Design a protein with these regions (language model features):
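Intrinsically disordered, low-complexity, charged/polar segments
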Residues: 2-3, 59-80
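Mixed-charge, Lys/Arg-rich low-complexity intrinsically disordered regions
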Residues: 2-22
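Serine/proline-rich low-complexity intrinsically disordered segments, especially terminal tails, linkers
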Residues: 17, 43, 48-51, 73, ...
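Basic/aromatic-rich interaction segments and small domains that mediate binding to polyanionic partners
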Residues: 35-63
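Short, charged beta-turn/beta-strand-edge "cap" motif at the junction between a beta-strand
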Residues: 16, 32-35
Length: 80
C-alpha cells in the first residue's frame, strides 16, 4: 500500500452569517484562520458569540452581529 501526502491549502469558500456557521468550520478572525468550537446567541438572536481555537490551540471568543458576514475557509488539494 502506497502512502501519499497531499498538499492542502486553505481557500475562501463562502461568506456566511453567524447563524449559518457550524462547529469545526474554519473562519477568518483578525487576519487568522481559526476553528469554530462553540456558537451562542443572545435571546433576540442579534448578537452571536463564536468561541474559536487558533493554530496554537489558544481559545478565544469573538462577537458578530446577526447581519455581519464571516469568511468561511476550506482545505483543498493544491496538487490538482
Amino acid at each position: 500500500m502506497n502512502a501519499t501526502i497531499t498538499n492542502m491549502e486553505l481557500k475562501l469558500a463562502d461568506s456566511l452569517t453567524p447563524d449559518q456557521l457550524m462547529i469545526e468550520d474554519l473562519i477568518m478572525v483578525e487576519d487568522e484562520v481559526v476553528e469554530v468550537i462553540a456558537i451562542a446567541s443572545d435571546s433576540a438572536g442579534s448578537i452571536y458569540a463564536i468561541a474559536y481555537k487558533d493554530e496554537f490551540g489558544e481559545k478565544n471568543v469573538v462577537q458578530f452581529k446577526h447581519d455581519e458576514f464571516v469568511s468561511l475557509y476550506v482545505y483543498v488539494d493544491s496538487d490538482t
